[in-house]
Amino acid sequence: CIRDRASISALGKGPSTGKDCLIDKNSDKTLFRRCAVNNAAYDYYKQCQATGVTMPPKNLRFWILNILRPSSTLMMHHGALLDSKLVSKYLGKYSSLIRIFAPDITIGSRDKNGNYAELYSTTVHEMAHASHFSKVGTDYWRKYATYIITSFINTGDAYGTGNGENAGYCQVGEMWGYFMENSLYKERYGRDPGYGQNYWFAPRIFSELESGGLTRADICSCLNYYVNDLKSLKAALLENYAAKSSLINKVFKKYSR
């Protein structure tokens, strides 16, 4: 379910077999945003099928918010119980719609209108978080999302400095989100955009582990409920992939803070 300010777009009547039409940056802006997000989400599902990465939950509910640039994976429609006052501050004038259209994913499209690549990368990043949610559940997600929202409200930066309560949840989650975003962007556009490299967490850890022989599915399999900081992440990787211990130790040492 994809919503843009709780409105709908239609392409008119067509046969039950489907309808071909060209939607580009010169088309209706709302329709373009929805198509870009829909296509990116579909591509992510296909990537999960091909690589063995855990699928996001079914029936995800998207909000596309042109008033915001940041995006988020709140998973409210799937039961993540977040502080309503915090979410209201984050969503601003759309807060009154929370109870009616509890979002799983919000896509902040401000300054991205007509830019397919940015909408694509943003969407697959949030879809990677939804895969993570499938692994860890609602209690874990409440701590993670609360850290993100609180940091954004207090500082304007969703990730903070890495020192706040539950920062480790953010560390693991954003490493995974940026790793998948960069990987899928590179496969689609032929270059690594390097998103997330200047923050206090290190998505390159996963990139180098993949280059050393661990698959995305291997990495995803370690993102369980008990992995909530870099120390527990490393321990899970070593426990599950002891044959790669030399690689794991080397990479984590390289990116230790």
Which residues fall in each region the model found?
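Acidic/histidine-rich, surface-exposed loop or edge segments in extracytoplasmic proteins
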Residues: P15-T30
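Auxiliary, metal-adjacent structural segments of Zn-dependent hydrolase domains
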Residues: R34-A102
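Active-site scaffold of zinc-dependent metalloenzymes
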Residues: M75-G137, Y147-I148
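Pan-zinc metallopeptidase signature
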Residues: R188-R257
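Second-shell loop/turn segments in exported
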Residues: N26-C35, S109-G114, E118, G162-G168, ...
